């Protein structure tokens, strides 16, 4: 195995350690975590991963960088007719946080419950990324409180009044009786395919 492939294997081992422990191993423990036999090997690995932008040294400690949490984006794959396979010699890197969250200071997540938004691609159990304090417009999918009850729906304008429109014909449009407060705009969503 060449050095670059070995470093990727070590990096992925460190990612697994981080996911399980929510902490980074000390230099002393890193040899055991990644399977190196010497302190010199650990120092060399940390140096290479730091030079590549995955790790940083701060106050004598090692910490993961934003790039540590980025993953390879291998390109696109057709959902229709299969296409020739690219060799993926080069690849882009994707950080999910950067992809989904433009304003971390005003972003939260909500779990979708129910099937009123399936036409918009939101399924029961999906996680929606909600951006607060964002201007809204008709057509936006929003998390709103209508007459004291929270929901996720498409914002629409009918006869000069805002209404909440489901994206499933089995449900009716919600016309606010007394109050409508938009808590935020849905700017993204994700789901685990292994629920």
Locate each region found by the language model.
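C-terminal regulatory/effector modules of DNA-binding transcriptional regulators
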Residues: 122-195
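Short, positionally conserved secondary-structure boundary motifs
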Residues: 5, 29-32, 40-123, 150, ...
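Alpha-helix initiation/capping motif
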Residues: 3, 101, 175-179
């Amino acid at each position: 195995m060449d050095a670059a492939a070995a470093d990727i294997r070590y990096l992925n081992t460190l990612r697994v350690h981080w996911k399980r422990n929510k902490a980074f191993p000390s230099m002393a423990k890193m040899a055991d975590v990644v399977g190196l036999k010497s302190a010199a090997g650990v120092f060399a690995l940390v140096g290479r991963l730091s030079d590549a932008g995955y790790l940083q040294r701060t106050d004598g400690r090692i910490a993961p960088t934003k790039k540590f949490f980025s993953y390879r984006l291998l390109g696109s794959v057709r959902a229709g007719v299969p296409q020739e396979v690219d060799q993926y010699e080069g690849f882009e890197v994707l950080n999910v946080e950067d992809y989904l969250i433009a304003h971390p200071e005003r972003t939260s997540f909500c779990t979708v419950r129910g099937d009123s938004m399936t036409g918009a691609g939101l399924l029961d159990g999906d996680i929606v990324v909600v951006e607060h304090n964002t201007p809204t417009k008709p057509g936006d999918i929003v998390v709103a409180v209508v007459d004291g009850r929270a929901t996720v729906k498409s914002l629409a304008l009918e006869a000069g009044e805002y209404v909440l429109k489901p994206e499933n014909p089995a449900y009716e449009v919600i016309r606010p009786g007394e109050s409508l407060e938009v808590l935020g705009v849905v700017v993204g969503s994700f789901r685990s395919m292994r629920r």
